[in-house]
């Protein structure tokens, strides 16, 4: 996958594209992207995703905390594994936010990114205030030379609270993680939810009582942390993977007041390399 941030330096070839923030790169995203790839192969064109390095709402409101399922780096890595040709990274600026859907399609999709076919997710909207819909995009596409295609809706086999075939969305996955439903979240994501960070110094009280723990500082402060609780986890450290136990919440080994922490206990290996 080629990541293109500056089209003045690299001119993308004509493509079949879709647009989205793709937080989590979940099952619904993957189904949409697979359709893009299939149409691109049939048309003899490149496949492309137009996405944003920063959540659009955070650009407009710096106090907004998006609770990301994937950091920008994690998202790019997951998208690369899917195998699209281009990841077109668009900086969402106040100027971009003011573009109507027609202006966005003309100035960015057609003139900058050379998009020939635009595949729209079943509930996706774009343009100023997201006030226009699929039929508008089709009409604008005919006027400027982009064929707009409605993607097939993704039907899950996931049942939640006795409701079958629940539509998968990033919002649903956030809700599940806030409830501690990590298994259901994994079903929606098609991979186990993960946290990435560095080990930071602690009080080492756990070591004294026979349960040495590593204190984790998550790399991105906007990354969503699941509900407080104890979880069985896989821990990757120094290119090796171990079974572990993760505690999220107030430290059980020491009075840490109201501060929320993440502690992992790796078993059954030596802990000396974590200090």
Predicted features along the sequence, with ranges:
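N-terminal catalytic cores of NTP/NDP-binding nucleotidyl/phosphoryl-transfer enzymes
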Residues: 9-71
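Active-site-proximal cofactor/substrate-binding loop regions of enzyme domains
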Residues: 46-61, 66-112
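Short acidic-hydrophobic, aromatic-tinged amphipathic segments that line or gate anion-handling sites
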Residues: 2-8
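Residue-level signal for inorganic ion chemistry
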Residues: 26, 79, 118, 185, ...
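Aromatic/hydrophobic pocket-lining residues that form π-stacking "cages" and hydrophobic walls in ligand
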Residues: 36, 137, 272
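Phosphate/ribose-recognition catalytic cores of enzymes acting on nucleotide-derived substrates
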Residues: 202-274
């Amino acid at each position: 996958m080629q990541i293109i941030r500056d089209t003045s330096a690299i001119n993308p070839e004509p493509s079949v594209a879709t647009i989205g923030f793709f937080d989590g790169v979940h099952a619904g995203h993957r189904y949409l992207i697979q359709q893009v790839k299939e149409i691109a192969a049939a048309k003899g064109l490149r496949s492309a995703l137009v996405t944003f390095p920063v959540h659009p709402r955070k650009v407009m409101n710096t106090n907004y905390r998006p609770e990301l399922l994937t950091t920008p780096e994690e998202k790019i890595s997951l998208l690369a594994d899917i195998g699209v040709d281009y990841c077109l990274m668009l900086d969402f600026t106040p100027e971009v936010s003011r573009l109507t859907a027609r202006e966005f399609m003309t100035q960015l999709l057609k003139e900058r990114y050379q998009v020939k076919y635009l595949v729209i997710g079943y509930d996706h909207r774009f343009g100023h205030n997201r006030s226009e819909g699929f039929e508008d995009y089709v009409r604008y596409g005919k006027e400027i030379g982009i064929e707009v295609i409605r993607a097939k809706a993704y039907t899950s086999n996931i049942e939640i609270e006795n409701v079958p075939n629940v539509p998968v969305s990033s919002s649903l996955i956030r809700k599940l993680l806030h409830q501690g439903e990590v298994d259901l979240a994994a079903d929606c994501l098609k991979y186990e939810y993960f946290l990435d960070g560095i080990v930071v110094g602690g009080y080492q009280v756990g070591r004294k009582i026979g349960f040495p723990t590593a204190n984790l500082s998550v790399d991105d402060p906007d990354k969503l942390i699941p509900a407080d609780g104890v979880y069985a986890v896989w821990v990757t450290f120094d290119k090796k993977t171990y079974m572990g136990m993760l505690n999220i919440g107030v430290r059980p080994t020491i009075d840490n007041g109201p501060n929320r922490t993440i502690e992992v206990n790796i078993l059954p290996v030596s802990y000396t390399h974590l200090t």
